């Protein structure tokens, strides 16, 4: 299990041994990652950095530093990078779409820091998310991929 710590897109540290790790992936879209690592002689892990684990990126939101058995440790709490879409600046009024999934994702991610990768489903889809306003973009994205 290796965790890469990135700052401004560059790897500043690779953690190959962790003391504890916990990944929470729920049906409601919750995706968090917490881990504890030795800090001795390593660059500090700070909120605002990014952790990469198992091909997924997580925003480091909290770091608690302390000592255990005389060793300096960092307890790190992370949220999946997609939580950025919860920021108010990305809210939508509504989202109505009819077309191919890749095009819908392109439209949903427009004006965000994200881009569409490989999209396997090719059948036409239609959706109308008009039941709440403002519409949280991450919630709309989760609803769209469930279509």
List the model feature ranges, each with a label.
Residues 73, 79-147:
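Charged- and aromatic-enriched interaction segments used to assemble
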